[in-house]
Amino acid sequence: MATDQPVTGSRPAWFTAALFGMIVPAVALVALASGPEAASLAVIGGPVLALGLMGAGMIAAAASGRLWIGVALALLVGAGFLALAKGLGLAGGVPPLATGAAMLIASVSFAVRGALFARSALDKGWWIAVFVVAGEAAILITAAAAPGALPDWLLALLPAQWANRSIQTALGGMGSLAAGSALIALAGTAAATLLVAALWPRRWPYVIMFSTWLALSALVYHYPAPPVGGSL
């Protein structure tokens, strides 16, 4: 899926994608891994990978107007973080299929939202993506650093948290089905968002998109993924 606009040459847009998608998560991973009480990869990797995939996928898709660019960049970022984690001695025994499936579904879901921002707001779409990423990242980091500080219903509304929990359970060796509700929510909202983008500028598909988001949030709330012990 592509917009009618050419790929933006805006340096701030691509710098922001690199900042949220690569620099901040990489620094966080190194800092957390080198701490006096380094947490397991399942605890660190979930929020870090979710932030990286969201920042790279959503902002890149919004900046370029190309869904595939967002997906490709997000997956490259995810692979890079796993390689970095391995170099730091954290990534022993990562389940490849479950982790890869969670990363792929999350990458597509984030990139579809970015592509919709590009289609609806044209060359300003990446600004919307930045604000969305910043807001979800703030809640994601708070939830990871202080478990229980935020209500479960709020976390159930966040696609970033869906990605976090699906990646956490995969890295923890629990398999994809353990976070089935989160994966279904990511895939379902991606499909609904893709429908809105495909039918733009018609506005009625937004009703389907928001209804799908609320319904799938309820699914995640009532059927949460099993917790992975520890905090950042």
Predicted regions located by residue number:
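Short, Lys/Arg-rich, polar N-terminal cytosolic tail immediately upstream
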Residues: 1-10
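Alpha-helical transmembrane segments of multi-pass membrane transporters/translocases
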Residues: 11-29, 173-226
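Long, hydrophobic alpha-helical segments
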Residues: 19-35, 39-59
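Membrane-helix interface and helix-disruption motif detector
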Residues: 33-44, 63-66, 87-98, 120, ...
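Alpha-helical transmembrane segments and their short interhelical loops
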Residues: 59-123, 194-198
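Central hydrophobic cores of alpha-helical transmembrane segments
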Residues: 73-77, 126-137, 157, 206-216
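Transmembrane helix segments
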Residues: 124-154, 221-223
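Membrane-interfacial helix-loop-helix junctions in multi-pass membrane proteins
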Residues: 140-199, 227-231
